[in-house]
Design a protein with these regions (language model features):
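A short linear-motif detector with a strong N-terminal bias
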Residues: 37-40, 60-63, 108-109
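Extracellular/periplasmic head regions of type IV pilus-like filament subunits
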Residues: 55-60, 82-84
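Divalent metal-coordination and catalytic microenvironments
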Residues: 12, 63, 119
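Active-site metal-binding loops of divalent metal-dependent hydrolases
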Residues: 15-17, 62-64, 86-88
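Metal-dependent phosphoesterase/phosphodiesterase active-site architecture
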Residues: 1-4, 66-189
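Active-site-proximal segments of metal-dependent phosphoesterases and phosphodiesterases across multiple
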Residues: 2-57
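Internal, well-ordered interaction modules that form the hydrophobic cores of assembly/scaffold domains
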Residues: 53, 63-66
Length: 189
């Protein structure tokens, strides 16, 4: 598909690729490459596929709890925005409903709390950008407008971040500053 549509801006979606520490690293207990050499781990996916195709400008992944962002240049010098978001382990809504903390893990039972990533692409200006936000269909609010957001989730997901850093990891703008030089102007979008 990449060869057939060479030059078309491409976003790759995959499962276990980026960690909450912004590393291309699989969860060790399910690193399929360690079990079967035919499987590719995250670094191999970068080395064999993503970095080798100039049209790939973004990678979206999940699986590892929390959020991550890594921006690197591919073998052609183009930026690749690698974004991870996974909220399935969140359980504040269960706590709100009276569900006890899991006695074995010391964590709420993860049901996700309806959190999802929203990405709005804007190609109207001289530099295109992506607005990234995090919204809960349960709480019906964006993460930046929920007073308890960092208090509920930061400790278990990103304990080394400040509350402000944690909020910024779930709501930010990415300028796609090399997009037009790679793919042409907005007239074709």
């Amino acid at each position: 598909v990449l060869k057939k549509y060479d030059g078309l801006p491409t976003i790759v979606t995959t499962h276990d690729y980026l960690s909450a520490n912004n590393e291309k690293k699989s969860v060790p207990i399910i690193d399929f490459h360690a079990v079967d050499a035919r499987h590719n781990n995250a670094q191999m996916l970068w080395d064999k596929l993503i970095s080798q195709h100039s049209q790939i400008f973004m990678v979206l992944s999940g699986h590892q709890h929390g959020q991550g962002l890594l921006i690197e240049k591919n073998d052609f010098g183009g930026k690749v925005y690698q974004i991870m978001a996974d909220y399935q382990d969140r359980g504040q809504s269960g706590i709100d409903a009276g569900q006890p903390i899991d006695p074995y893990t010391g964590r709420p039972v993860g049901i996700g709390d309806g959190w999802m990533r929203l990405m709005t692409f804007d190609f109207s200006g001289s530099v295109p950008f992506v607005e990234v936000s995090t919204y809960s269909s349960h709480y019906l609010v964006d993460a930046n407008h929920l007073d308890n957001y960092a208090a509920w989730y930061r400790r278990l997901e990103q304990p080394n971040m400040t509350d402000d850093e944690f909020l910024k990891a779930d709501s930010y703008t990415l300028e796609l500053d090399d997009f037009y030089s790679r793919f042409g102007s907005s007239s074709g979008l």
